[in-house]
Amino acid sequence: MGDPLLPGSTGLGSGSATAATGGSVTAGSGLGNGGTGGAERPPSPARLTHTSEKHPKVTLTELNMLRRHRELCDVVLNVGGRKIFAHRVILSACSSYFCAMFTGELEESRQTEVTIRDIDENAMELLIDFCYTAHIIVEESNVQTLLPAACLLQLVEIQDICCEFLKRQLDPTNCLGIRAFADTHSCRELLRIADKFTQHNFQEVMESEEFLLLPVGQLVDIICSDELNVRSEEQVFNAVMSWLKYNVADRRQHLAQVLQHVRLPLLSPKFLVGTVGSDLLVRSDEACRDLVDEAKNYLLLPQERPLMQGPRTRPRKPTRRGEVLFAVGGWCSGDAIASVERFDPQTNDWKMVAPMSKRRCGVGVAVLNDLLYAVGGHDGQSYLNSIERYDPQTNQWSCDVAPTTSCRTSVGVAVLDGFLYAVGGQDGVQCLNHVERYDPKENKWSKVAPMTTRRLGVAVAVLSGHLYAIGGSDGQCPLNTVERYDPRQNKWVAVNPMSTRRKHLGCAVFNNYIYAVGGRDDCMELSSAERYNPLTNTWSPIVAMTSRRSGVGLAVVNGQLYAVGGFDGSAYLKTIEVYDPETNQWRLCGCMNYRRLGGGVGVMRAPQTENYMWCDNSFRQHNL
């Protein structure tokens, strides 16, 4: 199969000074010229500047040794039951708190022993060590004492490190605790990130014990947000009632205060009347009954709705809700497969949908006009030029799409200006630089300008009206080169290359950058990732994925970047991971039903209501 998408494939001059005999040395004579009779040398520089890179580290090391031996120490810090010896000048240089203490008119400026209260002694020792060594380890066991101590001592760098550590620890079971911790210590950026995480993952957060233990004020802060990520307002009401019933005796007095932030007018009539209106706690509170009546009027009197607009009638607006990810074909258990499955980030579930009519590995996948196209590939025996098209409304594939002019596997596919482009790949004889595009109105493929380089296992992306061909292999070795197609000029031009050679990589456009992840270089599968800034024409690294992934799919779903499947050098993968640009971290977030190498991925909008759902091989409409 050619290159199938399978694993394995300075001195001074010599003149002498005459000062001893009464002579003189002038610039450019003895030292610079090497004496008389020889060829003249350029004059020596009159100044040599040197900056030692070792000096700061060596100096700190020696100062720390003095401290350890209690030499030249001029202050002792009494913290808890511990005495910490130090030098005022070092502490003052590192901490604004100590600088104010020792250089001002405070009593401590004249004391040799100073008592520091309201700070953990272990945290203080770690921070003093940092002042002398520039080294600290932040971990789960100490971050909750280090951060308040760093805030007190005004060690901003340590505050930032602690906040960064806590950002990386965020999950639905602890985000509320981290949020409260950030609020207590005025860590605004950490508070913002924790808020965003809570809003986005509210459906999981509401199941946590931390949620049930929230004070009423913090609960209100969360549920009043427009950015709360929920499938329906029913989830918010159910979350509030779970919180209330955790401690009914103490919390029922707050029901109306909380319920006014649930957007009751956005509930279905059935749920409003049958669940909310019939709840005994709601019915027993006059203010709650008024809120229910307000919602009923909103639903029953549509002509009056323009006059009834307010915070409770405003739909919540999480970023780009309603997208689902399809994983199409690929290589699994030694053979090409036809199976297709769909991932819903709202439920974190994978569901099987109708399979393709042909098995396809190395298939190119893209979405055009709300239809999912599967282009070319290899069925385990033959290279394919056939195309299939999937309609999510009927859960059916059709084969009435014109074939490409060449058989192609390991092909890059993307949509630009209403055309479907097929880029590179291999046809079983050679690696291709051919590019063609499909016009859905004419059901016809036509060739455009070829790339300057042959590329199989190429990744393609569309950004700012241009089509990018990224990496791949020329049939001999992996590439790091990148070229860009301008459809107005029908011309390819080179842009700056990636830092790493990659074939069978994943690629997607995210927040106006092109992300390139995984793939395979000359000798191994890759976990590394990088992104391209078209404004500066530069690539920069991001954190590596948790797994090596060649033949990986990459896609943006509901504003998040997902890496799907691939091959890690020893096994086909069914895991997926998601990238958070705020924390520059990848995290695993579930598994497909099938392991997939070289499968395609595509993103489509889900149906607008929940009356529709995909099942294994059928599409049903429910009357709810």
Swiss-Prot record:
Pathway named in the protein's UniProt entry: Protein modification; protein ubiquitination
GO cellular component terms attached to this protein's record: Cul3-RING ubiquitin ligase complex
Residues of the BACK domain: 175-277
Region described as Disordered: spans on this chain: 1-55
Residue ranges of Kelch repeats: 324-370, 372-418, 419-465, 467-512, 514-559, 560-606
PANTHER family: KELCH PROTEIN, KELCH-LIKE PROTEIN 20
Domain BTB: 73-140
Keyword Transferase: no
Record SMART domains: BACK, BTB, Kelch
GO molecular function: actin binding; ubiquitin-like ligase-substrate adaptor activity
Domain of life: Eukaryota
Its biological purpose: Probable substrate-specific adapter of an E3 ubiquitin-protein ligase complex which mediates the ubiquitination and subsequent proteasomal degradation of target proteins. May have a role in synapse differentiation and growth.
GO BP annotations, alphabetical order: negative regulation of synaptic assembly at neuromuscular junction; proteasome-mediated ubiquitin-dependent protein catabolic process; protein ubiquitination
Ranges annotated as biased composition (Low complexity): 15-28
Protein's name according to its UniProt entry: Kelch-like protein diablo
Biased composition regions of type Gly residues, renumbered to the chain: 29-38
Gene that encodes the chain: dbo
Family annotation (Pfam families): BACK, BTB, Kelch_1
Keyword line: Actin-binding, Kelch repeat, Repeat, Ubl conjugation pathway
